[in-house]
């Protein structure tokens, strides 16, 4: 969430910057609420001061042998009035907090202004799409012909947007995840983590999925008097980032770089009718996630580094891609700046997103109270948090199948994966 003090003091400027994201901040309502808050705050403080002053006079009256009943009655009356004002103030602060929770992050000044994805800006491109001398097949046809992608049984077992993988395809899927983890831990300096696939509401609030995006989640256990509800993770970003919730990290331990391979679960509530064929948009999919926790002055360079780490995966696999900086109107809710990496898919004759790398700055950290402190610092400061896919495993499998297909329907195994597949050079 945004800094409430900054939001109140820079209301007009904040509204202007949020408008570039297509978010309309109700300035008039917030201004009125802020005026009321100030008034209630002053009234509460004045009542508290009056009550304290009169309470002190009780002892003095007793010492003089005077009747303290009238003073006690006055203190009681002030106490009731004070409690009423405190209740009113608490309700107002709760309303202001709810508004703050619904406001997206401010775009960084380096982000291009635009309304939607059509105004994203390409920053670089790597590799040249292969020209095939035969009619290319898409990953669905390739995988089904090999006997490794079974959509029919997935529908029977669960429903649409699920997959059963078997044989050499399942092995390649596993090999891709292992390759990514090994690359990030041995060459990019990340620490591998194994994390829960179920998270509570505080965790989802911390990273920004709640309260705004609850419909995108698979909820497995509702909240009760005994505890919070639990939901399946939409991304390992949630458990990884929440490792520092309510924590003060020593500055010497920064940066913290974490990676994890997990299944991810998304209802795709807003994606009806999109990418209904194949593995591009599934309710359950695997992803290798990267998270960095850094000092504020280091976060923009960390975003460049993290994006580069995701790009190296594609380079080592020999998959052509382009990197886009998202415009203000296409960024995620909590992001201050995002790069999307899009891989070339021959069957679609276009680039498709395979990784999204974002700098959240202190947006998540403020929600989580994730802070750091140097040896000479008097007070802790908020961390900056970053996350990115390194990569989406299923979409990477799609890219390998389509880019490495042969005329006979077989798939050449990329050299980077052969050590993970027993030396196989082809499958199918």
Swiss-Prot record:
- Asked if the Swiss-Prot or TrEMBL record annotates the protein with the keyword Ligase, the reply is yes
Molecular-function annotations in GO: ATP binding; serine-tRNA ligase activity
Question: Per the UniProt record, which EC number(s) apply here?
Answer: 6.1.1.11
Q: Which residues bind ATP?
A: 266-268, 353-356
Q: Which reaction does it catalyse?
A: tRNA(Ser) + L-serine + ATP = L-seryl-tRNA(Ser) + AMP + diphosphate + H(+); tRNA(Sec) + L-serine + ATP = L-seryl-tRNA(Sec) + AMP + diphosphate + H(+)
InterPro entries with a match to the protein in the record: aa-tRNA-synt_IIb, aa-tRNA-synth_II, aa-tRNA-synth_II/BPL/LPL, Ser-tRNA-ligase_type_1, Ser-tRNA-synth_1_N, SerRS_1_N_sf, SerRS_core, tRNA-bd_arm
Q: Which GO BP terms, alphabetically?
A: selenocysteine biosynthetic process; seryl-tRNA aminoacylation
A Pfam cross-reference name: tRNA-synt_2b
Q: Name one GO cellular component term.
A: cytoplasm
Record: residues binding L-serine = 235-237, 289, 389
| Main location, first listed in the record | cytoplasm
Q: Which PANTHER family match?
A: SERINE--TRNA LIGASE, SERYL-TRNA SYNTHETASE
> What domain comment accompanies this record?
Consists of two distinct domains, a catalytic core and a N-terminal extension that is involved in tRNA binding.
Briefly state the protein's biological role: Catalyzes the attachment of serine to tRNA(Ser). Is also able to aminoacylate tRNA(Sec) with serine, to form the misacylated tRNA L-seryl-tRNA(Sec), which will be further converted into selenocysteinyl-tRNA(Sec).
Q: Which family does it belong to?
A: Belongs to the class-II aminoacyl-tRNA synthetase family. Type-1 seryl-tRNA synthetase subfamily.
Quaternary assembly: Homodimer. The tRNA molecule binds across the dimer.
For this entry, the protein name equals Serine--tRNA ligase
* UniProt organism field: Shewanella pealeana (strain ATCC 700345 / ANG-SQ1)
Print the organism lineage. Bacteria, Pseudomonadati, Pseudomonadota, Gammaproteobacteria, Alteromonadales
